[in-house]
Amino acid sequence: MDSDDDGDRRRDKFARERRDDDSYRRSGGGGGGYSRYDNKRPAGRREDYQVKRSRGDEGDDGFDPVRGDRNGNGAEPSSENSIYSGPLLPFKRFLTNQEDDISEEDAIKKYNEYKNEHRKFQLDRFFRAHKDEEWFRLKYKPEEAKKVKEVQLENVQKRLQIFNELKEQGQFDKFTLDFEDAEAILRMLDSVVVKLENGSEDDLKAVLAQKLDDESLADVKKENKDAAEKVEDQVKDEVKEEPNEEQEEGAIDDETDKASNKVNIHKTCSVFLRNIPPGLTYEELESTCKKYPGFLRLALTDGIAERRFYRRGWATFKRDVNIKEICWGLNAHRLRETDLNAIINRDITRRVRTNNGVAAHKQVALNDLKLAVKLTALYDKKLGLFNAADESESDREKDIRMGVDLVAASTNPLVKEIKSIVPKDTLNDISEEEAELLGVSNGGDSQSDKVRYERDDTILKALDLLIIYLRIVHSIDFYNHGHYAQEDSMPNRCGLIHVRGQPPSGASINTDENGDLIVPQKFINDFISGFNSRIDKGLIEKQYVSEEDMEKMGKKDGEKEVEAFIAINTVELAKDKWLCPLSGKKFKGPEFIRKHLQSKHEDKLEEARAEADFFNNYLADAQRPVDLEPKHMPHMSRDDHRGGGGDRGYGRERDDDRGPGGGRSSFGNGSYDRRPPFPPRHSLGGRGGGGRMFDDAPRRQPVSYRDLDAPDDIP
């Protein structure tokens, strides 16, 4: 009978083909030492798997081969391209494929060339893999991206109309953007939502007469005792008038269904869809959601790289539907053999949130006013509002890129009004040299000085108008330095806003003999600097890709692509006998095939041109999505696997992939599925010395200095 060791050896013969999840989930323990897995598994060649490519036969270089596009239309790469198909090689790994006597200068030059070619190859492969996915087409395909921008412009123009209506009615004069006015701010947000939902004046009156249920109001009560007493008195009066007020949280007290519909017009129910495959289209999802009563709209995100470019979505329904039944129905319905993983989306319970109260200080407010004016002029220009309406998109983009003074050129009536409200030259920027000469480069005071906390109502009034304009028209939450780009498709079409909080407090902030707050100048300067930085990075700055970089990344020429398409469809069969594979017809010469394609298949030639523009749009995006790069594991020696000294043992490596709470991160290493990624397999011997990664990968022979005339018994 065979021994256990013999049986183990026979099983180990096929260890490389087996993927036993349970075996590698068991850690080797401690800071190193062998685990059972380490003893059983021979050396492997592959590093952590790249998420979006399926596992297949391993290439000679130890990296995944190209699988073509997602639909299987791409061909396997040729052998000379195999070095580009995997992750970028480190410099040391790259040198193993070079000559031994290569100079340092040549090595660096060749490595830079390799990096450029690798980048070009990876971008082209990513484009081919995702070009048929809806999110990618909407983002970069010229005709589809144009439609998206047209819809966006329509939404912004409607929001602009609503802003002007509310402004003419004096709605913005009833409050300031301070947290103590949270109730009036909530009423303003509700008014915007009712108008966005095409509600009537009766609907608006019913909504404004409704009792507000928001945690922001409770916070106001806690922060201001006097205001809290007034609110409590109002609540008591309302209780006397409405005896049926005691209801569950979120419930609405109305006498009839008709009144309920009016009150609920600004509220919705929604379902969050966590798992939308990249190939699933908006129309497919929308048709599924329309099967349920009360469906309003659907919002989908772009593909998420960390989740294999799966998307997330929100399906919005009317408030009076049974959202639980709808959620159950969506979970029971599979689309393309995929579960949507729908859950009920929670309502926003705190719609008014606070920024640091120092934002009301005159110096800070003046800085914010300049930023708000710039943002207003910039986003008006981007979307083609006011004087930019007659300009082409390329001309508008050129002006922005060249740094044209958009504030001075703006014809937005609100910008003109702001200029008339604030003192002259308030909005003018000064140069760095002028600031240094005037002694205002650091805020005008020494960093160690303290200044009196001062509010300027004129500046704050102008600032509030601009912030409300940005929030309603452009969906920009100024004090949160965020842009809610998809807000018109989301469940809450004007959901929340950040405002100024209570005046600052802390150990470094005190009061003078008059009871006025005294704030350190350094605190103010640091706050301004940090806020400006976040606004610039989040809302103003845009990275551009130069023409030179686009050429390096493989920019395509539309006419050259057409010529290449014609060449592919021109096949010589014999003398004076040519075939057009596209139509299957035969011609006497290539010039006849060209004429045939230009007359009968002009649409195909246009597709070739459009494909080039499609690809170039992808390259022109500095924030373009790409595949996540797998991590390279360091070469490990034999001693690293043994306990007692190595801090990079196998058990430690797995710990490095864990999330901040100690457990494995849900999407660690860029993996969408919840299984841990396949661990690297290390050699425990052989090849003279410590184990190395990629034992089967080609490598240059070590240089030897052996005397060929020496006897065989002398090494």
From Swiss-Prot:
One of its GO terms (biological process) is primary miRNA processing. InterPro entries: Nucleotide-bd_a/b_plait_sf, SE/Ars2, SERRATE/Ars2_C, SERRATE/Ars2_N. It comes from Caenorhabditis briggsae. The keyword Nucleus applies. The keyword Transcription does not apply. Residues 7-25, 37-57, 223-242, 629-659 have a biased composition (Basic and acidic residues). It holds the Pfam family ARS2. GO terms for cellular component: nuclear body; nucleoplasm. Belongs to the ARS2 family. This is Serrate RNA effector molecule homolog. Residues 243-256 have a biased composition (Acidic residues). Keywords: Nucleus, RNA-mediated gene silencing. It is found in: Nucleus. Acts as a mediator between the cap-binding complex (CBC) and the primary microRNAs (miRNAs) processing machinery. Contributes to the stability and delivery of capped primary miRNA transcripts to the primary miRNA processing complex, thereby playing a role in RNA-mediated gene silencing (RNAi) by miRNAs. Residues 1-87, 223-259, 629-715 are annotated as: Disordered.
